[in-house]
């Protein structure tokens, strides 16, 4: 998969889920359908009075996820959300309304002035699929950001006993000194971490 492939898939998926954090530190999640992409930047629409807006203004860290049920593909975005500048609000609102005509029934006539547009252009994107064996996982950095890898790594304390390889459900640990986890196929289950007799495996 490429970045472009992931964007196309996110466009094709009917609705995405977006996660925020409220003022009490509790996670909140919502479905968003009214969104468009301009290259790799995603623009989405909501209404000014919603708690969703307050949450994004208080904590701009968000996560977005899309799941393709037919292909068992998941794409996750994590990054910093930004409110579109006042000069650009009308432009992107009109583009979203053109893409999603049903919005005219939700916000008819002048009531659409309550809308506000946000965007996310600097983010990490993770592609994960269960359709391959072993599973496939890819990371991308979009805009002004760096890839934040997750998972497990085998350190130099490894004694090459082979325990990790034996307990890996995807069989993606390669023999060596030290043994090596194939990161693009790692399930992140932690079974190797739990079973290493010398604690040579670290989470990052």
Descriptions of predicted regions:
Residues 80-148:
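Charged, gly/pro-rich active-site loop segments
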Residues 8-24, 62-66:
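A short, Trp-centered hydrophobic/proline-enriched beta-strand micro-motif
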Residues 35-72:
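A short mixed-secondary-structure module that forms the rim of ligand-binding clefts
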Residues 63-88:
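Helix-adjacent hinge/juxtasegments
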């Amino acid at each position: 998969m490429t970045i472009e492939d992931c964007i196309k898939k996110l466009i094709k998926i009917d609705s995405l889920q977006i996660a925020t954090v409220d003022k009490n530190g509790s996670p909140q999640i919502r479905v968003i359908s009214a969104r468009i992409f301009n290259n790799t930047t995603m623009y989405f629409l909501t209404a000014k009075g919603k708690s969703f807006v307050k949450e994004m203004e208080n904590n701009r860290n968000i996560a977005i996820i899309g799941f393709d049920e037919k292909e068992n593909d998941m794409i996750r975005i994590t990054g910093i959300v930004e409110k579109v500048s006042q000069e650009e609000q009308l432009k992107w609102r009109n583009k979203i309304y053109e893409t999603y005509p049903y919005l005219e029934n939700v916000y008819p006539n002048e009531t659409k002035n309550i809308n506000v547009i946000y965007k996310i252009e600097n983010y990490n994107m993770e592609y994960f699929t269960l359709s391959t064996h072993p599973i496939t996982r890819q990371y991308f950095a979009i805009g002004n950001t760096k890839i934040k890898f997750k998972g497990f790594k085998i350190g130099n304390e490894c004694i090459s006993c082979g325990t990790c390889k034996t307990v890996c459900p995807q069989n993606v640990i390669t023999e060596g000194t030290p043994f090596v986890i194939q990161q693009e196929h790692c399930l992140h289950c932690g079974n190797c971490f739990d079973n290493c007799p010398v604690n040579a495996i670290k989470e990052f």
